[in-house]
């Protein structure tokens, strides 16, 4: 069989209460917002979806297996660092061909932050930014994202077997 594998990653996080003082982080970018997302790490849904897509493409366990929310070492962890670690776990036997990701929320709009998100994700994966796509969409006011209760993200990662492996 060929040397390509694809993985799908999905993540969702609810907004935290403003009194918790959490910052909103998407793709490693701190985005001005009254509310951040609730989570054990920095709750970066975009980075988490990409991480799960990468791990899935390599046929490995999910993000929670490697970075469990029961482990205090990962409390408030930088999710771009988690992605970088997941890339290390996947190892050199696979090359990232591309990643396509979408953030699903009514607010905030991510357009002005997309390029920096792409750069952050690409750097963590060890590829040029042209191999990473980040888009935003709404759920047309349907479901928990439509009601402004949280943010979701989905990502697809294509891996190719590295030459000589």
Curated annotation (Swiss-Prot):
- What is the protein's given name? 2-C-methyl-D-erythritol 2,4-cyclodiphosphate synthase
- Identify the metabolic or biological route this protein is part of: Isoprenoid biosynthesis; isopentenyl diphosphate biosynthesis via DXP pathway; isopentenyl diphosphate from 1-deoxy-D-xylulose 5-phosphate: step 4/6
Taxonomy, top ranks, is: Bacteria, Bacillati, Actinomycetota, Rubrobacteria, Rubrobacterales
**Subunit organization:** Homotrimer.
Alphabetized UniProt keyword annotations: Isoprene biosynthesis, Lyase, Metal-binding
Give the family from UniProt.
Belongs to the IspF family.
Q: Which gene encodes it?
A: ispF
Going by the entry's taxonomy, the superkingdom of the source organism is recorded as: Bacteria
What Pfam families has UniProt attached to this entry?
Answer: YgbB (PF02542)
């Amino acid at each position: 069989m060929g040397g390509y594998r694809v993985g799908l990653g999905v993540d969702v996080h609810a907004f935290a209460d403003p009194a918790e003082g959490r910052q909103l982080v998407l793709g490693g970018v701190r985005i001005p917002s009254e509310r951040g997302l609730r989570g054990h790490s920095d709750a970066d849904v975009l980075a988490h979806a990409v991480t799960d897509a990468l791990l899935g493409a390599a046929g490995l366990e999910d993000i929670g297996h490697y970075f469990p929310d029961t482990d205090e070492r990962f409390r408030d962890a930088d999710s771009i660092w988690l992605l970088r670690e997941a890339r290390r776990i996947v190892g050199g036997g696979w090359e990232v061909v591309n990643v396509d990701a979408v953030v699903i929320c009514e607010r905030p709009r991510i357009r002005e932050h997309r390029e920096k998100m792409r750069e952050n994700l690409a750097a963590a994966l060890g590829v040029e930014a042209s191999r990473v796509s980040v888009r935003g969409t709404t759920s047309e006011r349907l479901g928990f994202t439509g009601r402004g209760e949280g943010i979701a993200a989905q990502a697809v990662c294509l891996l190719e077997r590295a030459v000589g492996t």
